[in-house]
Design a protein with these regions (language model features):
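Short helix-loop hinge/linker segments at domain boundaries
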Residues: 77, 109-110
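Long, contiguous secondary-structure blocks with strong helical propensity
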Residues: 8-9, 33, 46, 71-76, ...
Length: 110
């Protein structure tokens, strides 16, 4: 049986690679799980739930998740400003995959 190498270009076009690109990041999965657990979450609440994340990192990560259509951002025209975040249907569809990864990690921890 001849084994072939998988080229980087070929690997980058797979669904696997695309999925990893969406959840790759120190806090992305934590943010997705926080939104799954609590539903609609305001920015400062999210910061409290996660803890060690900076405001700048939280803001940029939420913008990335919003651009990937995994998170919905709802802004209310009031003073002080009120912004809420929630999972989109697309974001919710990732949760079973993340659950599977967590389950595997729990069973295979060294």
């Amino acid at each position: 049986m001849v084994k072939r190498c998988i080229s980087q270009e070929c690997l980058e076009t797979t669904g696997f690679s695309y999925t990893l690109s969406l959840i790759n990041g120190k806090y992305k999965m934590t943010i997705l799980y926080t939104l799954m657990e609590f539903g609609v979450v305001r920015f400062n609440e999210m910061k409290k739930y996660i803890g060690e994340i900076s405001y700048k990192t939280l803001s940029s990560t939420l913008k990335e998740l919003e651009a990937d259509q995994l998170v919905h951002r709802k802004e209310y025209p009031q003073i002080p400003p009120k912004v809420e975040y929630s999972l989109t249907d697309r974001g919710k569809s990732l949760i079973p995959i993340l659950d599977g990864m967590c389950e595997w990690g729990s069973k295979n921890r060294l």
